[in-house]
């Protein structure tokens, strides 16, 4: 690797594990993702943090949750779902193709909806929606009482925020972690 390259990643593994897992989408021209792919057991990486604040607030575990993610933005929700299996939650995961879905079998079809925007729209054991998460939200209004957590690219976050607000979800019930 050589030089210091900074990137922000969200922890994928739950706190109960004795190892740290992150999801990294390999970008063809990407410096860091390409180098991470070449890492071998025993290679040294410098990690700083955590710096985010995504968590289930005390006293809210009995409420209904809506997790909305695109791509590797599913990371915090995977961690939250494994750490809090009792949550009444639904996860919308927006991807271009089924190969980009991560561990969907952990959630069950009643709690997981894959929103696939590309032309390949088949995946076994998954509830599929043909289109983006934003289109799904427009067609399936969200109850204003849901706690909504969003993670992914900024365009999706801002658009989902506006849709959730139009459904009557107050800003105090919308939490976001923006990737880029």
Where are these regions (language model features)?
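FNR/FR-type flavoprotein reductase catalytic core
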Residues: 31-180
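Ferredoxin-reductase
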Residues: 1-41
